[in-house]
Amino acid sequence: MRAVTWAIVAMLLPRVLGAIPTRTPRTGGVGDTLSVAIVCHDLESVEVTWGPGSAHHGLSANLSLEFRYGNQVPQPCPHYFLLDSVRAGCVLPMGKGLLEVVLREGGGAKLFSRKKKASAWLRPRPPWNVTLSWVGDTVAVSCPSHSYPGLEYEVQHRDDFDPEWQSTSAPFCNLTVGGLDPGRCYDFRVRATPQDFYYGPEARPSKWTGVASLQGVGPTGSCTGPTLPRTPGTPTPPLALACGLAVALLTLVLLLALLRMRRVKEALLPGVPDPRGSFPGLFEKHHGNFQAWIADSQAAVPTVPEQDKDDDVIRPQTKGVETQEDDDVIAPGSPCLGGGALMSVGGASFLMGDSGYTTL
């Protein structure tokens, strides 16, 4: 019977405990009823921000803030900033001693309070003047250190083949990242992180610097796209050598193309003989005037010297044949010539007939 009773109690106890309302313990100061963020920017100023007031927490539109360092008299916020015409935060100056921050509803009930060193909410400025340089297969990263201690500098890098960031950290902004391939393009970024043992868990790291791209075989910032993977130990060919090989290959291709075109042209269009070999002086003396060249060539032919005309006359020896009258003789150059053979002797031409001859 007792065992049954304990079994029933064990079954009902979780339900009874779940029905009892519980209060969430507060993690902050007295009267916390809204979310407040405090940031100490590079130990130069303190920024306190909170929600939009009544729109989220059912409170009055504007809250008031008081602060003091050490045992000073509480002071009102020197500079509020607004969000949608409602107070949303306050910027405080730096001071010595513990910082106490109090938020009130219209100057009455306390809604939030904190009391710590301002450095407990430290957020350093991002590193500046960061320099990256290749040394073999490592990249040296350096930048000026902050004016206060307790920071750790973190460098992250990645390449086009591994998009996940890889981290390297050191207590000073002078560190090296090893195991890199100079033929690849890498992205780098740097930030400063407060150490927990020095500032506490509420300190926040700085923002990342802008991403800088770097490649070992090219000028700084020359990364224009993904690079092809290389076999380890194989040096990257210089750009000049690659360009020279490309030019030589292109020249060889052009020469082969020209030679092939010349052979095709010779097969389709046979060569035309040069008239200078067959007609000497045609172009040198007569400028291509063929008629003038013919006249000059005929004038240069040696002529046979003329003999006595009486020797060239052949007189018929037949008796009883009378000489033709003058009016029967055909004048030289007459277009109406009789029949007979044309004969040239020396520079004279004769038309031979059956009964005589005629001088032309």
Swiss-Prot record:
Its main location: membrane. Glycans are attached at N62, N129, N174. GO terms for biological process: cytokine-mediated signaling pathway; inflammatory response; positive regulation of cell population proliferation; positive regulation of interleukin-5 production; positive regulation of mast cell activation; positive regulation of receptor signaling pathway via STAT. Residues 1-18 form the signal peptide. Pfam families: CRLF2-like_D2, TSLPR_D1. The keyword Aminoacyl-tRNA synthetase does not apply. CDD domains: FN3. Residues 260-360 are cytoplasmic. One of its GO terms (cellular component) is external side of plasma membrane. Expressed in all tissues examined including brain, thymus, lung, heart, muscle, stomach, small intestine, liver, kidney, spleen, testis and skin. Highest levels in thymus, liver and testis. Heterodimer of CRLF2 and IL7R. This is Cytokine receptor-like factor 2. The lineage of its organism: Eukaryota, Metazoa, Chordata, Craniata, Vertebrata. The gene is Crlf2.
